[in-house]
């Protein structure tokens, strides 16, 4: 599920970056700085997803109920932390972008990519990774149920 969210984040960011470059909004090219931007996005996205998944893991033994309810409560518990860290990161990267916009240097593209990546990563850690986890877990449980039924026959 985390890999699904990670691929989502990278592809959406890459798409926005391609649109911005094509429309001459920013200057960016494949360079070490752009690779660093995507590695930053990957790290940020994984960290956010791990925080949510860790809370789900902590809540599963403590809470009774459907997995969907546990996931929902876990997202609600981590929501403030996720939003605060995202806003803090966005503020600093937005300042970096504002200071470099129009300069046509590598930091302009870096800041733009990280801004898009942080926004998309924050969204996906809650609304892509968690539903994907639920879907994968339900499939796993259904397969385990089918295997038990086949064994009993």
Task: Locate predicted features.
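Hydrophobic, glycine/alanine-rich multi-pass transmembrane helices and their short helix-loop junctions
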Residues: 27, 84-137
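Membrane-interface segments at loop-to-transmembrane junctions
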Residues: 1-5, 71-78, 149-153
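Membrane-embedded alpha-helical bundles that form the substrate/pore pathway
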Residues: 5, 9, 41-44, 48, ...
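Interfacial helix-loop-helix hairpins and adjacent transmembrane helices
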Residues: 131-153
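Helix-loop junctions and hydrophobic alpha-helical segments within the transmembrane domains
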Residues: 63-83
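Hydrophobic transmembrane alpha-helices and their membrane-interface caps
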Residues: 1-57, 98-99
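Active-site-proximal inter-transmembrane loops
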Residues: 32, 37, 65-72, 144-145
